[in-house]
């Protein structure tokens, strides 16, 4: 059976993790890349239900699974990811021709990371509305993730946040690791995020030219 790439998506509550999945998935499918989706909630499967509604007609419901962890979000993706690994393996067995599994953690604090037993690669999502101090708080998710997404950039003037300060601090905290600003409502920055994912995580399954060349 071929290796299906596992991409974790973490971040605080309300930062836009689900929105990232909902905007990235149709773009992956348009490129011929076959995704599966797992969402995590502590006591519900509400995110999975929302993703099924949003992606109705785009991805069949059976390929979107909700995991009710019953525990701290980072425990379910780092210290003891057994429930998620079981969900991953079940999906892989049912859909072995898939290319990527997107695994959304429950909303958590800035220390969230993914166990390498669960995810090959992970994206951390923060949002501008939480304040421009967030990147310099030295959270493991901000500093160690493969890609940092700073979402809701359009809200900066309404909350007194400086995108320039966030960019400066992200560079300081992350070194050469990439970060970018997005607005998942309008799609701004989403194609750039997709290109990073293709180049960094899905290079072994992508056989198509870059987005700009294939448009």
Curated annotation (Swiss-Prot):
Job of this protein: Facilitates the functional incorporation of the urease nickel metallocenter. This process requires GTP hydrolysis, probably effectuated by UreG.
Compartments, as annotated in UniProt: Cytoplasm
Binding residues for GTP: 11-18
CC per GO annotation: cytoplasm
Protein name: Urease accessory protein UreG 2
Gene Ontology biological-process entries: urea catabolic process
Broad class of where this protein is predominantly found: cytoplasm
InterPro entries for the chain: CobW/HypB/UreG_nucleotide-bd, P-loop_NTPase, UreG
Gene giving rise to this polypeptide: ureG2
Pfam families listed in its UniProt record: cobW
Assembly description: Homodimer. UreD, UreF and UreG form a complex that acts as a GTP-hydrolysis-dependent molecular chaperone, activating the urease apoprotein by helping to assemble the nickel containing metallocenter of UreC. The UreE protein probably delivers the nickel.
GO function terms (MF aspect): GTP binding; GTPase activity; nickel cation binding
Keywords per UniProt: Chaperone, Cytoplasm, GTP-binding, Nickel insertion, Nucleotide-binding
Source species of the chain: Methylorubrum extorquens (strain PA1) (Methylobacterium extorquens)
Top-level taxon: Bacteria
Positions of transmembrane segments: none
Recorded family membership: Belongs to the SIMIBI class G3E GTPase family. UreG subfamily.
